[in-house]
Design a protein with these regions (language model features):
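Short beta-strand/loop segments at the ligand-binding rim of alpha/beta enzyme cores
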Residues: 3, 72-81, 128-132, 143-152, ...
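Conserved, mostly hydrophobic/aromatic
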Residues: 9, 47, 55, 81, ...
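Conserved anion-binding
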Residues: 11, 15-26, 94-181
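N-terminal beta-alpha supersecondary unit
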Residues: 20-64
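Glycine-rich, proline-tolerant flexible connector loops at the mouths of alpha/beta enzymes
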Residues: 51-67, 105-113, 176-185
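C-terminal helical cap(s) of enzyme catalytic domains, especially alpha/beta-barrels
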Residues: 113-125, 216-261
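Charged helix-capping and loop-helix junction motifs
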Residues: 115-120, 156-161, 186-195, 244-246
Length: 261
């Protein structure tokens, strides 16, 4: 069954929810949906108490290492961490309490070409069983292309079943943000979910556009329950008015809790 995987998105040392396609190097075009008064460790402890394992801490740019470590310390082994991961620092983040490290940009050169040697270096550093490959993507003609550098740069790698087959040998899970709909609360990229949901070889988590619990049910149906889901800006926990966090916890526990606000 499709599980709810919680998230802690960090930007400038604060827990935030941002519109996915607006995060640039200079920050001028940044659109923020929510900035929390609570620290990352508060969220990590909440997820721990509610038994929501497998969530992710994402560091969006510099100035987030300290708060990310605080979150991991609040739930050792309960959260994955991503953002700026390299073969050189990955083991350090595992030692800090991350269950897995999440990688994207370091797998590509400046031109957006996949560097299999870097992927193999990461496997050597922490093991495939500790690696989550973030294939967050944007729509291009004929499909989806993996996006790197805060989702601003399209790589040459297309998100296809063939790509997943090749990369599956080097990781434990995939994380897929549909960057075009991330943070907009306008519904999921159904075609992307359908394509990914037919693959089913490794655990996979989808994020992007979820605005009601029925979206999670749809992901469940399209993937045969093999794909998990992350909810961000729609969630009351992050200032949203569309989905109650308590309903997602209840759903996970097999109770009825499917009303939306």
């Amino acid at each position: 069954v499709t599980r709810f995987r919680p998230c802690i998105d960090l930007h400038g040392g604060r827990v935030k929810q941002i519109v996915g396609g607006t995060l640039t190097q200079d920050g001028v075009s940044l659109r923020t949906n929510f900035v929390s008064d609570r620290g990352a460790a508060w969220y990590a402890d909440l997820y721990r108490r509610d038994g929501l394992s497998g969530g992710h801490v994402i560091k969006l740019g510099p100035g987030n290492d300290h708060v990310a470590r605080e979150a991991l310390a609040a739930w050792p082994g309960g959260l994955q961490v991503g953002g700026g991961m390299t073969p050189e620092n990955a083991e350090e983040w595992i030692s800090s309490g991350a269950s897995h490290v999440i990688v994207t940009s370091c797998l590509f050169d400046a031109e957006g070409t996949l560097r299999m040697d870097r992927l193999k270096d990461l496997v050597s550093a922490v093991g495939a069983e500790r690696l989550v490959l973030d294939l967050s993507c944007r729509r291009v003609q004929g499909g989806w292309a993996v996006a790197m550098n805060r989702w601003q740069t399209l790589t040459e790698l297309r998100v296809t079943a063939e790509t997943l087959d090749v990369l599956a040998e080097y990781c434990a899970e995939f994380l897929i943000h549909a960057a075009d709909v991330e943070g907009l609360c306008t519904g999921i990229d159904r075609e992307l979910v359908e394509m990914l949901g037919n693959w089913r070889r490794l655990p996979m988590t989808y994020a992007g556009g979820i605005s009601r619990i029925q979206d999670i049910d749809e992901i469940d149906a399209l993937s045969g329950g093999t794909m998990d889901a992350t909810v961000g800006s729609a969630l009351d926990l992050f200032g949203g008015g569309l989905i109650r966090y308590g309903d997602l916890v209840a759903r996970q526990r097999g109770k009825s809790g499917t009303e939306t606000v």
